[in-house]
């Protein structure tokens, strides 16, 4: 199953929206990201978060409050979707705002349980999370394309053909 998490940062550009929204995935708002998605005309199935930045009056019956203040709304939302069986999660709306939120987004990838391929879509690139418990993964990069590999936790990486 595929899901999109729309965060409360700057709205993604049209090319990201075209790419991600065409994947027949269910859209979830991460707190105030639900309002931003709705403003773009996107149907949001459910709001996930601590609800501190969303107008919950417009979302009656589609709100799941995630109270744990030890984790970010994004980390909690990824955990909920993984528990529900989603195996592909695209995250959008993460650009802009405080620089610390960038680190928080990557930390959410580290904290997320195994079982789902997670991608954060930036205006100029995509961050893909590969969890070591998910087994071997292959990531193909086209000739001449720029890529980077960073291990946020201990792991093993083999690169060939670069």
Task: Report the location of each language-model feature.
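N-terminal beta-strand-loop-alpha-helix module at the start
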Residues: 1-58
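Short gly/pro/ser/thr-enriched loop/turn and capping motifs at secondary-structure boundaries
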Residues: 34-37, 54-56, 98-99, 124-129
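Non-catalytic positions within long, well-ordered alpha-helices that form the structural scaffold/packing
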Residues: 38-40, 82-85
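Short phosphate-binding loop-to-helix
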Residues: 63-83
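Short Gly/Thr/Asp-enriched flexible loops that form oxyanion-binding sites at enzyme active sites
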Residues: 99-111
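Short, acidic/small-residue loops that bind anionic groups at enzyme active sites
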Residues: 113-128
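Long, charged alpha-helical interface segments
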Residues: 125, 130-162
């Amino acid at each position: 199953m595929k899901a999109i998490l729309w965060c409360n940062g700057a709205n993604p550009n049209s090319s990201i929206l075209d790419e991600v929204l065409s994947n027949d995935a269910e859209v979830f708002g991460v707190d105030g990201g639900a309002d931003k998605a709705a403003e773009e005309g996107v149907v949001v199935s459910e709001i996930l978060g601590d609800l501190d930045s969303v107008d919950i009056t417009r979302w009656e019956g589609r709100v799941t409050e995630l109270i744990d203040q030890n984790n970010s709304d994004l980390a909690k939302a990824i955990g909920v979707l993984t528990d529900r069986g989603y195996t592909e999660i695209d995250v959008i709306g993460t650009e802009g705002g405080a620089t610390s939120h960038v680190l928080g987004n990557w930390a959410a990838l580290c904290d997320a349980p195994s079982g789902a391929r997670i991608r954060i879509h930036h205006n100029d690139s995509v961050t893909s999370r590969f969890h070591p418990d998910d087994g071997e993964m292959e990531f193909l990069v086209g000739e001449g394309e720029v890529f980077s590999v960073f291990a946020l936790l201990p792991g093993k990486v083999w690169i060939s053909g670069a």
